[in-house]
């Protein structure tokens, strides 16, 4: 008698045939850094050998298949990043900015913001990352962009991911200083009590139109993200433990708290922001797609820089 109902489970010690989401991200980041750092269109063969010998890849021949697939996936990103960087070596900017902030009632405090920003090319700041960029990544680019603008830089800033480029138009040093000061005030407020601000959900909210409840529902996928693009555990901001402990959706997401804060942080950024596919980057950059002009000196809403708006704004950050 043959029993065909045996439940054969894989041993925990079996060799994997693929990488999980975090392992895939880290491997692609290594491949990107190696190629772009050397100005090459593909990673160095020595890195490939070291990766194979590290024991972190699947067994042969699946390691070769995996590496070839990842190199194919990141090739457009490498090419567009090298195009933006150009042949000149990237430089850095030393940041030193002084602010008088109303941190306590009736009294201002002087704050020194000091640091260094790398990866500055003749076309502006150029950052890149594997996978898809979301609200947190765009906010990080925005903060660096404001620091550079406040120091007198006059070029756009770019973030490239696997399928799109994200660009921020230059503004005057005075305007950047004002925006940074407001964000610093919020930073100090956040040290006193939690702020109802989630980068991805907030950006999706600001990118939508309509009444508060309608915009909140359109931003809901960023909070839940039950259908993760990674095909594994949910990665929505609502699944992060510190948010779960503090905020409940939609009870704590009122227009006066969540909505007003999202608008305060992201609305000035959205007026400078453009997102498009990597295939459109070369044409955009060669046509001097973003330049500093009088229209954006005091931009506070999405109409102030109509030519610079996100061409995919209807999709927001869900792309």
Protein language model features and the residues they cover:
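Structural signature of nuclease core domains in nucleic-acid processing machines
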Residues: 1-319
């Amino acid at each position: 008698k043959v029993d065909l109902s045996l439940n054969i489970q894989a041993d925990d010690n079996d060799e994997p045939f693929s990488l999980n989401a975090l392992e895939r991200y880290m491997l692609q980041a290594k491949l990107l850094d190696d190629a772009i750092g050397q100005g090459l269109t593909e990673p160095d063969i020595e890195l490939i050998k070291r990766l194979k010998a590290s024991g972190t890849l699947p067994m042969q021949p699946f390691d070769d298949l995996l590496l070839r697939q990842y190199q194919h996936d990141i090739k457009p990103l490498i090419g567009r990043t090298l195009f933006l960087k150009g042949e000149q070596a990237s430089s850095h900017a030393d940041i030193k900015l002084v602010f008088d902030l109303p941190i306590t009632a009736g009294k201002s405090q002087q704050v020194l913001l000091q640091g260094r920003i790398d990866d500055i090319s003749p076309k502006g700041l150029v950052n890149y990352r594997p996978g898809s960029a979301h609200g947190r990544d765009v906010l990080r680019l925005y903060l660096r962009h404001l620091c550079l603008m406040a120091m007198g830089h006059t070029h756009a800033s770019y973030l490239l991911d696997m399928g799109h480029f994200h660009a921020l138009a230059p503004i005057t040093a005075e305007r950047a200083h004002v925006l940074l000061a407001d964000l610093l005030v919020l930073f100090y407020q956040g040290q006193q009590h939690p702020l109802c601000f989630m980068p991805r959900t907030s950006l999706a909210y600001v990118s939508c139109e309509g009444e508060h409840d309608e915009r909140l529902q359109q931003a809901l996928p960023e909070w839940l993200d039950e259908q993760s693009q990674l095909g594994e555990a949910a990665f929505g901001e609502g699944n992060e433990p510190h948010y779960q402990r503090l905020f409940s959706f939609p009870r704590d997401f009122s227009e006066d708290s969540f909505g007003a804060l999202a608008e305060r942080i992201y609305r000035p950024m959205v007026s400078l922001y453009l997102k498009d596919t990597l295939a459109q980057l070369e044409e955009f950059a060669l046509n001097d797609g973003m330049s500093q002009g009088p229209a954006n000196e005091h931009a506070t809403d999405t109409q102030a820089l109509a030519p610079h708006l996100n061409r995919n704004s209807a999709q927001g950050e869900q792309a």
